[in-house]
Amino acid sequence: MNNLAEKKCIPCSLGTPPLSSDEIKRYISQLHEEWKVINDHHLEREFKFKNFKEALSYTNVIGQLAEKEGHHPDMLLSWGKVKITLFTHKIDGLSESDFVFAAKVDKQQSE
């Protein structure tokens, strides 16, 4: 889908500004259409599954990806669905790494 998935998540330094609205628009266009930008602050996408067990298994897959990348999303697990929320806590907003991680999630979904 894009080359964002080939990049690495890189930690931000304190004081790094969050992405601008224009930068966010450029990055979001490279992700699956189900990703939503909320208040120019975070990304969200909900994934649906047949049951709780499959949803739980998916959180573990994404958890392994998060550990590998050193970038950790918020995940809300409920029956048959997982909502992933991404933003960079250190800068309280979106960074390139949030979009890189989202692209890696998209790639994981397509495999």
From Swiss-Prot:
GO function terms (MF aspect): 4-alpha-hydroxytetrahydrobiopterin dehydratase activity
Entry annotated with the keyword Lyase: yes
Gene3D superfamilies reported in the protein's UniProt record: Transcriptional coactivator/pterin dehydratase (3.30.1360.20)
Reaction equation(s) it catalyzes: (4aS,6R)-4a-hydroxy-L-erythro-5,6,7,8-tetrahydrobiopterin = (6R)-L-erythro-6,7-dihydrobiopterin + H2O
Keyword Transmembrane helix: no
Keywords in alphabetical order: Lyase
Top EC category: lyase
Entry's EC annotation: 4.2.1.96
Annotated InterPro entries: PCD_sf (IPR036428), Pterin-4-alpha-carb_dehyd (IPR050376), Pterin_deHydtase (IPR001533)
Matching SUPFAM superfamilies: PCD-like
Gene Ontology biological process terms in this record: tetrahydrobiopterin biosynthetic process
HAMAP family in the cross-refs: Pterin_4_alpha
Family stated for the protein in its record: Belongs to the pterin-4-alpha-carbinolamine dehydratase family.
Name of the protein in question: Putative pterin-4-alpha-carbinolamine dehydratase
